[in-house]
Amino acid sequence: VWAYVNRFGTMRPYTYRVKATARGRVYSLPINLHTINQFFGTAMGSAEARAFVAAKAEQRDETASFEDYGLALVGRELYEAFLDGYTRKQWGLDPAELPASILKRLPLRFSYDDRYHDHRFQAIPAGGYTAIVQAMLDHPRIEVRLSTELRRDDPYDHIVWTGPIDAYFGFEHGRLGYRTLDFRHELHDGDVQGCVVMNYCDADVPHTRITEHKHFAPWETHDLTVTTTEFSRAAGAGDVPYYPIRLVREKAQLREYVARARAVTGVTFVGRLGTYRYLDMDVTIKEALDAAAVIRAGLADGTPIPAFVVDPLA
């Protein structure tokens, strides 16, 4: 993946770090040794903090729900301060109704490592993501058509569908549930929040986070700054679908669509929308490369090309 993206532009080293405002104070995220000492007003070392948090952890079935996993992981005080309110706003649901897998994506560290990700390679395109995508599409065998409706009876050798899987089948089993985002962009002088992202954990604050974009490129200098405030809500028919909900009802619908997809030929479903899964960027690129290899091999030797390279139900 790293070698692939570097073919299309210069990547600048960048470490994504997030701060959080909770109960009127600013903390380090994801929850780490600094967060714990900040929150409890202590100066514990790693081993002491690990034992301290373990003593506060509740005995819960960690697989039952987001809430159960969170309380079993960090105890009620840290859970209610940093996880409960933010999650209610982001998903519009009680955390007791959400799967534990959502929280398992975030680390708990007993060190002062406040990186949001611990991947080996962490960077951002020096010229922005638009330039990277433009370079990917700049190929003599690629034709880009905008505002073009797909008709399934058109004579394509094979379709790679990255749109919503339910939309491909005309929503015949109903619309899959998504959360969408509303953005409020503002222009300011100077520097507003001093960091790239500030999460707002309290449930009574309507927005989930504020992004100050110039901090994504610390090698640049700007007198002005743009902030974007995010508000999460249920996605409607005309909204951009961001986060698949994947609760019991949605999983039942998804099974119907997956069965439908596997019964047709000439199309492969990929990506967040095509497989109705929450995917990070590196995973998305890896799955796209894998799908391309499978499709190319199938077209070359005439073997059946699967509807999915990765099982959406796994």
Can you describe what each PLM-predicted range is?
Residues 2-23, 78-81:
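A short alpha-helix-loop-beta-strand transition element characteristic
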Residues 7, 139, 294, 298:
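Active-site catalytic microenvironments for nucleophilic, acid-base chemistry
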Residues 12, 143-147, 268:
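General small-molecule cofactor/ligand-binding pocket signal
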Residues 20-158, 162-167:
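Active-site/ligand-binding neighborhood in enzyme catalytic cores
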